[in-house]
From Swiss-Prot:
Record's compositionally biased regions (Polar residues): 26-38, 286-298, 340-355
SUPFAM superfamilies: SAM/Pointed domain
Entry keyword annotation includes Cytoplasm: yes
Compositionally biased tracts (Low complexity): 495-506
Biased composition (Basic residues): 418-430
Annotated compartments: Cytoplasm, Cytosol; Cytoplasm, P-body
The protein's name: RNA-binding protein VTS1
Listed CDD domains: SAM_VTS1_fungal
Keywords linked to the UniProt accession: Cytoplasm, Nucleotide-binding, Protein transport, RNA-binding, Transport
Predominant localisation class: cytoplasm
Alphabetized SMART domains for the sequence: SAM (SM00454)
Length: 577
């Protein structure tokens, strides 16, 4: 059958294209003669054309990858003249021969497994006699029972011999290991040769170049390398010195030739240092310490200066009298009788220098009056009534009298009243006490009423003066009644009918004293508001008494009770002036 494309040049001269593969000229001429004698086989039109084409593409790809020449043209020429007999081996299928011979796949050799899977169908090649027409297939199929796709390797003359050599396949790892060992040995040889060259180069340098080289290495080498080199050098020098010392004396060692690793310009200096180290011992260190201690003893000893007294703290000590001797919160006149600073005259001198010495005089007088109360009168009264009710009644009477005495303590405790009380009872005071400012003794007993009014007056008027007196113990009933009724003194003051006490009964009598008003810190201390001294000390008193509640709060007086107390004091000063 004449088809287009078969008259083109041979397959070897053309590139591979996606078209039905051409066949060679000899095969094509053979097929033309065969087709002229016999017509196309039955069922040729129903044959699947793509099977042979796919096999050809796979074969060409495999040939290009392996770079092998699988075409045996010599055998093909011999087999063209001598056609194959019709009888083939049992492993070759019937349907393989006509289709492969027609499409130029006669040189393909296949085994029984592949031909049974693809080409044994009778529909693909129904014409059996055409199997004997292709002469080239016989030479490839003479290998009976061979299941390989390719022909035997011995039949390919152009195949390189190294392909068949598998002797070194399992020895590659050993060869690689031997190669690595040779390279390492060569590198080690090169390393030691480089070290020898480097040492020889160092020996040729002069001392100045040696110093330059050492400086460069110290500045550029890593720290760990320098430390390792230092330790090795120390151990080497120590070993060299010990070995030399055992063999010969030190003066002979200096005349020896320079050994390897020790620089000759510095050998003398090194030997001197080692000699000095040998001469050092424990006795030398002890003697040096003893000499240092003698030098220290000969030097003048340094004396620590004594701390200076704080003159600022001592200045104005009348405002800080509370810091010298602590004052209790209850302001009880009996607390400080066992104080260690009981008879110190220094406090008396400081009080005489104070601008408010008249307040101290009045307060101390009240303290002495409260301390010199006459307990026998209370005991007589208790023996007459034989009950504690009389003591309670006398305590209430004392509170009322004390409320009257707070108006003016000097008038309530004048000398006429004290002499009258002394003549009425006919008793003399067993103890005598000196006043701190006057230096005179006072005698005479006092009633419980006068004692309590002095105690209440003292608690209301004096806030910063320590108590320096002693007194006899009072009966327990009187003490209990005092504790239970001491807080009611101001209420009694408010209910008293004195013409001078309206809204300022809780204020001290000297609240409007001009001397105190000119000294705001002392005036605030009298009111027990000295904690606000820093807020109000810079204000003139005539301006201060005009302040209201809001102004005081702005100045820093945050407590409501303190503001109310200041406002009452301002009203008292305004009324008195």
């Amino acid at each position: 059958m004449d088809r287009p494309g078969f008259s083109s040049p041979p397959f070897n001269d053309k590139k591979i294209v996606l078209s039905p593969p051409p066949i060679e000229s000899k095969q094509y001429s053979f097929l033309q003669q065969h087709n002229a004698n016999s017509g196309p086989p039955v069922g040729f039109q129903e044959r699947q054309q793509s099977v042979g084409y796919n096999l050809q593409q796979e074969f060409e790809t495999l040939t290009a990858d392996l770079d092998l020449d699988l075409r045996n043209n010599k055998d093909m020429q011999q087999n063209v003249d001598a056609p194959l007999p019709t009888t083939q081996s049992g492993n070759v299928g019937r349907g393989m021969m006509p289709s492969t011979s027609q499409y130029g796949f006669g040189e393909l050799g296949t085994g029984g497994s592949l031909q049974n899977a693809l080409l044994t169908d009778a529909a693909l090649s129904p014409n059996l006699p055409t199997a004997s027409s292709h002469s080239a297939l016989g030479s490839l199929l003479n290998n009976n029972g061979n299941g390989s796709f390719l022909p035997p390797l011995a039949s390919i003359p152009n195949r390189p011999q190294s392909v068949n050599d598998f002797s070194n396949f399992f020895n590659r790892q050993q060869q690689q290991q031997q190669t690595i060992d040779r390279q390492q040995q060569q590198q080690a040889t090169n390393f030691y040769s480089d070290l020898i060259v480097f040492c020889n180069w160092i020996e040729t340098l002069n001392p100045r170049d040696n110093i330059t080289m050492i400086d460069y290495l110290c500045n550029n080498l890593p720290l760990d390398i320098l430390l390792t080199f230092k330790s090795k050098l120390d151990s080497h020098l120590t070993h060299y010195h010990n070995q030399s010392a055992t063999s010969q004396p030190l003066h002979q060692q200096q005349n020896q030739p320079v050994s390897f690793g020790v620089l000759s310009p510095y050998q003398q200096q090194q030997n001197d240092i080692l000699a000095e180290m040998e001469n050092l011992n424990l006795d030398n260190s002890l003697s040096s310490d003893a000499g240092a201690s003698l030098n220290q003893k000969s030097a003048p000893a340094l004396q620590q200066p004594k701390p200076k007294l704080n003159s600022v703290r001592n200045h104005g000590s009348h405002l800080y009298a509370e810091q010298q001797t602590q004052r209790p919160r209850s302001a009880d006149p009996n607390i400080h009788k066992y104080s260690p600073n009981y008879n110190l005259p220094q406090q008396q001198f400081e009080r005489t220098k104070s601008p408010t010495s008249h307040l101290y005089e009045k307060t101390n007088f009240l303290q002495l009056a409260a301390a010199n109360s006459n307990p026998p009168s209370v005991s007589q009264q208790k023996g007459a009534n034989n009950s504690d009710d009389s003591v309670d009644l006398s305590a209430h009477a004392a509170l009322k009298l004390g409320a009257l005495a707070t108006i003016n303590s000097r008038v309530a405790l004048d000398s006429n009243r004290k002499s009258h009380v002394h003549s009425a009872h006919g008793h003399q005071q067993p103890h005598s006490h000196y006043f701190p400012q006057q230096g005179a003794s006072q005698h005479g007993p006092f009633s419980p009423a006068s004692a309590y009014e002095e105690s209440i007056n003292r608690s209301a008027n004096s806030s910063s003066v320590p108590i320096l007196v002693q007194h006899n113990k009072s009966p327990p009933g009187l003490t209990r009644s005092k504790k239970s009724t001491e807080g009611l003194g101001q209420g009694a003051n408010a209910s008293s009918g004195s013409p001078q006490t309206t809204s300022t009964t809780s204020m001290p009598a000297d609240i409007s004293n001009p001397d105190l008003l000119n000294n705001i810190p002392a005036w605030l201390k009298l009111l027990r508001l000295h904690k606000y001294t820093d807020c109000l000390k810079d204000i003139y008193w005539k301006d201060l008494i005009e302040y209201d509640d809001l102004s005081l709060e702005k100045r820093g007086v945050k407590a409501l009770g303190a503001r109310r107390k200041l406002l009452k004091a301002f009203d008292a000063v305004k009324e008195s002036s």
